């Protein structure tokens, strides 16, 4: 659970950092650059913590995808950017992709405990001796030099 919180914090930090970058470029104020540097750095730190338990592909898709959606909305509201029908279609497609990636994440089933901790494909196999060569057993499929 904590790793998903790290991912959420990474997304929030990325959004703030990216919007601060735009603010700094529009206003020319140094404050935007400083906020951007700290937030983008914090975003990567939180993302690196999140991927300890959240699959990298899922974490990155959510981090970028949700970030793009929210940054686009705020860019329209705060910076007067426009949303064309093609951009809207792209955002809807992005939402669908995020949902598909997230729904495809399942915890892997715990492997069954087999005797001797051998994988099932090796369990029933027994070594077969095919013959003797100067007192040395030769196993099938292997070639041993006589000593």
UniProtKB/Swiss-Prot annotation:
Transmembrane feature ranges: 1-21, 31-51, 54-74, 81-101
This protein's record includes keyword Membrane: yes
UniProt xrefs under PANTHER family: SMR FAMILY PROTON-DEPENDENT DRUG EFFLUX TRANSPORTER SUGE, SPERMIDINE EXPORT PROTEIN MDTJ
Keywords noted in UniProt: Cell inner membrane, Cell membrane, Membrane, Transmembrane, Transmembrane helix, Transport
Superkingdom of origin: Bacteria
Location relative to the cell: Cell inner membrane
Chain residue ranges for the region called Disordered: 105-147
GO biological process: glycine betaine transport
GO terms of molecular function: amino-acid betaine transmembrane transporter activity; antiporter activity; choline transmembrane transporter activity; spermidine transmembrane transporter activity
Family: Belongs to the drug/metabolite transporter (DMT) superfamily. Small multidrug resistance (SMR) (TC 2.A.7.1) family. MdtJ subfamily.
Pfam family, one: Multi_Drug_Res
Job of this protein: Catalyzes the excretion of spermidine.
Lineage: Bacteria, Pseudomonadati, Pseudomonadota, Gammaproteobacteria, Enterobacterales
Name of protein: Spermidine export protein MdtJ
Organism field: Yersinia pseudotuberculosis serotype O:1b (strain IP 31758)
Membrane protein topology class: Multi-pass membrane protein
NCBIfam families: PRK10452.1
Summary of subunit composition and partner proteins: Forms a complex with MdtI.
Disulfide links within the chain: none
GO CC terms of this entry: plasma membrane
Biased composition (Basic residues): 105-117
């Amino acid at each position: 659970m904590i790793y998903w919180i790290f991912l959420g914090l990474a997304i929030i930090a990325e959004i703030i950092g990216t919007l601060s970058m735009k603010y700094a470029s529009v206003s020319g104020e140094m404050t935007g650059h400083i906020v951007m540097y700290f937030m983008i750095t914090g975003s990567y730190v939180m993302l690196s913590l999140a991927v300890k338990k959240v699959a990298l592909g899922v974490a990155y898709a959510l981090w970028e995808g949700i970030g793009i959606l929210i940054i686009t909305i705020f860019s329209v509201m705060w910076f007067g950017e426009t949303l064309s029908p093609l951009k809207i279609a792209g955002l809807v497609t992005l939402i669908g992709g995020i949902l598909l990636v997230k729904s495809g994440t399942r915890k892997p089933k715990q492997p069954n405990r087999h005797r001797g901790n051998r994988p099932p494909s090796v369990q029933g196999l027994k070594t077969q001796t095919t013959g003797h060569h100067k007192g040395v057993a030769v196993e099938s499929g292997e070639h041993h030099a006589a000593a």
